[in-house]
Regions:
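A structural signal for small-residue-enriched, beta-sheet-centric alpha/beta enzyme cores
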Residues: 2-116, 131-434
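Intrinsic disorder/low-complexity segments
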Residues: 117-130
Length: 434
């Protein structure tokens, strides 16, 4: 498998070199390939396959948008706890494609299952087991409402399967992560290690997302792979919990995609002994590692927000409940006025006050204390006596902005992450289909 240089022959000024990313390690039991089906007409990689020869346990969370991709509809119908493959395409969302999009997945899944089955029957050390269409998951990202390119994808299935690699380093992961991008300027990759009992466990993850980011359940596309042996039912519980404070804590433009999917796959190659329930103490370190990995990927998505120049961490503390803290945090983060002020490096804290007030939460204005960075800007229902406009303006020129809102109503807190709105965001989305 070679790096496709055409992935980089596009106007993406923030596109990073492979050396800028973590060293992702091999996950035993997983094979990966990424090829070009020429969906963009440029020759860039746009089709990716993750194959589990002996199957993988999995858990997934999907978009809460009432209109969703045919890929999501397909996946929700899968009742298998052990799956064999995940295929991902970019350029086309397979959303609002009607029966054509649905029939496309039926057609492609049958063809892919036959090609994989034939490969296993002919390969030395193959399983000689038939792969079934309902053991295959799909993910799609791209333009909504365009006819799904069935024949283009189907015609490249053999090529995709022939390119599968069971040994993967940063090079292979980087190629896979690059193949699922749309308006992203860089791939997103993350790696963690942990222990279950006394067994060493690896987790490797990739993600894509740059716009249409404001999740209600998951966000955009993110896939995590581990060599641990964990039942599917526990994987899903752990994933939902980890998503709550990672992918569900970010927003770029307040839009929830029709295609959002976050999934975790466990190849069961490291036997960890019986796990009695999701609260089993053996899983604590794995839970920590999963949370850290997902938050890493989520922050990378925010950092690559369409046209973004600033990464903003909004911390709501001392709220009555986490629900209150989260509502207020997102009320601020999703405000176009707030986000454009950040882009203009304007310490207009009135837009933070506005965001707090429009959240609908019952707050006590006189108790609120607001800091931008380490600088106190408001307290006791008015501007702080410590307010220093010049120091604030200097702070606002940094790439990383932290805002803390202390409600002084309780002990709950929530961190959310967003970015600024620049003129580039408008340009990118105005030209998205061109």
């Amino acid at each position: 498998m070679t790096i496709n240089l055409k992935n980089f022959l596009i106007d993406k000024p923030k596109l990073s070199k492979m050396g800028d990313f973590q060293e992702l390690k091999q996950i035993e039991g997983l094979e990966i390939s990424a090829v070009s089906a020429d969906l963009y007409g440029t020759g860039r990689d746009d089709l990716c396959l993750f194959y589990f020869k002996e199957g993988a346990n999995y858990g997934a969370v999907y978009t809460n948008n009432s209109i969703c991709s045919e890929s999501i509809i397909w996946n929700r119908k899968i009742r298998k706890s052990l799956i064999k493959a995940l295929m991902v395409n970019t350029k086309n969302a397979n959303t609002f494609t009607g029966s054509q999009g649905q029939e496309a997945l039926e057609n492609i899944s049958k063809h892919l299952s036959k090609v994989l089955t034939l490969r296993e029957s002919q390969k030395e050390g193959g399983t000689n087991q038939a792969i079934k269409p309902n053991e295959i998951l799909f993910a799609s990202t791209g333009v909504i409402g365009e006819k799904y390119p069935t024949q283009q994808i189907k015609g490249n299935i053999q090529f995709l399967v022939d390119k599968l690699k069971n040994k993967h380093n940063k090079f292979i992961w980087f190629k896979a992560a690059s193949s699922i991008l749309t308006t992203d300027t860089r791939p997103k990759l993350a790696y963690e290690e942990c222990k279950i009992g006394n067994k060493a466990i690896k987790l490797s993850g990739i993600a894509k997302g740059s716009g249409m980011i404001s999740p209600n359940l998951a966000t955009m596309l993110a896939f995590v792979f581990t060599n641990a042996e964990i039942p599917s039912v526990y994987l899903k519980s752990l994933l939902k919990k980890a998503v709550a404070n990672s992918f569900n804590a970010i927003t770029i433009d307040s839009d929830t995609s029709t295609n959002d999917m976050v999934a975790i796959f466990a190849t069961n190659k490291v036997k960890t002994g019986k796990i009695y329930n999701v609260l089993d103490s053996k899983l604590k370190d794995f839970e920590r590692a999963l949370q850290k990995l997902l938050l890493n990927l989520a922050k990378q998505i925010v950092g690559d927000g369409e046209g973004a120049k600033k990464f903003i961490n909004i911390k709501i503390i001392d709220a009555k409940s986490q629900h209150m803290a989260k509502n207020i945090g997102f009320s601020i983060a999703n405000s176009p006025l707030f986000k454009t002020a950040m882009a203009g490096e304007d310490p207009n804290w009135g837009r933070i006050i506005m965001g707090i007030g429009k959240s609908g939460e019952k707050i006590v204005p006189e108790k609120i204390e607001i800091k931008i960075g380490t600088f106190k800007v408001a307290e006791k229902g008015k501007i702080s006596e410590e307010y220093n406009e010049e120091k604030l303006k200097e702070y606002m020129t940094s790439d990383l902005i932290t805002i803390e809102v202390n409600l002084k109503l309780g002990q709950a807190s929530f961190d959310c992450y967003t970015c600024d709105f620049t003129k580039d965001y408008v340009d990118i989305n105005a030209d998205y289909r061109s």
